[in-house]
């Protein structure tokens, strides 16, 4: 039996980029304006706790231990509701954050790596290479389009 997940990754993902270029009220100056974050509250504590942890840059694998929940059961529940285990969700989340930060910011690689939850440069490089097909520095160069720099802010 193939059950369609109730929540997709794109429904749950929240970008670390919180501001975009826009105009002031008089339309005289270009300023950064806050972007509406599309944070979906599912009402399902298991999903909301995982998304909250990921948004805060924490590893959701710590949640079961802190909550006294069986890790395997929590991960299986995530898989049923989202089509992804907690590890798969965390990996995809980190990859998406890395892609956005590399494309739209000038943050040093070490800072991008930290914001993605990595302390190991080789592990971070493997994630980016596996996801995007190139190294972090190459991705930064190749993914940028004219006008990307300064388009968004954290």
Roles of regions detected by a PLM:
Residues 88-92:
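Short, basic-rich loop-to-helix N-cap that marks the start of a DNA-contacting helix
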Residues 1-73, 79-81, 85, 100-126, ...:
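Alpha-helical bundle regulatory/interaction domains
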């Amino acid at each position: 039996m193939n059950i369609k997940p109730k929540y997709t990754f794109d429904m749950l993902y929240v970008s670390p980029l919180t501001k975009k270029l826009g105009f002031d009220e008089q339309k005289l100056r270009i300023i950064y304006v806050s972007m509406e974050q599309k944070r979906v509250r599912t009402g399902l504590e298991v999903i909301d706790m995982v998304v909250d942890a990921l948004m805060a840059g924490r590893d959701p694998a710590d949640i079961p231990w802190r909550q006294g929940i069986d890790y395997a059961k929590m991960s299986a529940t995530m898989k049923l509701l989202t089509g992804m285990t907690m590890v798969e969700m965390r990996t995809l989340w980190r990859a998406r954050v890395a892609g956005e930060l590399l494309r739209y910011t000038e943050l040093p690689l070490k800072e991008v790596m930290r914001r993605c939850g990595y302390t190991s440069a080789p592990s971070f490089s493997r994630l980016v290479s596996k996801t995007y097909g190139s190294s972090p520095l190459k991705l930064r160069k190749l993914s940028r389009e004219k006008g990307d720099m300064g388009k968004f802010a954290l």
